[in-house]
Amino acid sequence: MKALLIDDEPLIRDIFTQFLELLGHEVDVAADGREGLARFDPLVHQVVLTDFLMPGLTGLAVAETIRARGHTTPIVMISGSATLRDERRAMQAGVRVLRKPIPFAQFAAALAEVVEHAGTGQ
């Protein structure tokens, strides 16, 4: 599986890239929401993982833009700062929200669940 990881913090990008590679996934990275949208290819990326709070476009804006373009690619928003209102908006866009810090096992389980549900149309 190939993932697109969008986060403005280099250390966080490195950590989640390592998580994804440990799980056997290939990873493309983007340093902000605009770059993430430019790099996103629904024919290449089976999942998008995005931070919530980034300069320019938030992760929520990225997710809403992807959905507005008609794409159903699974999206996981990883946040330490999203409000409950933000989380509700994300869930309405079909986005799975994970709160930082997140243990590796919980991240792996959530990622597997999101991808499995996308594959079954649920």
Language-model segments: which ranges?
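Two-component/phosphorelay signaling modules centered on CheY-like receiver
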Residues: 10-28
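Acidic, metal-coordinating helix/loop segments flanking the phosphotransfer/catalytic sites
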Residues: 29-47
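Acidic catalytic/metal-coordinating carboxylates
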Residues: 32-35, 57-62
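Active-site T/S-Asp motif of two-component receiver
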Residues: 50-51
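Receiver (REC) domain active-site loop signature in two-component systems and cognate sites
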Residues: 54
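Alpha4 helix (beta4-alpha4-beta5 surface) of REC/receiver domains from two-component response regulators
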Residues: 61, 82-99, 109
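C-terminal output helix
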Residues: 102-113
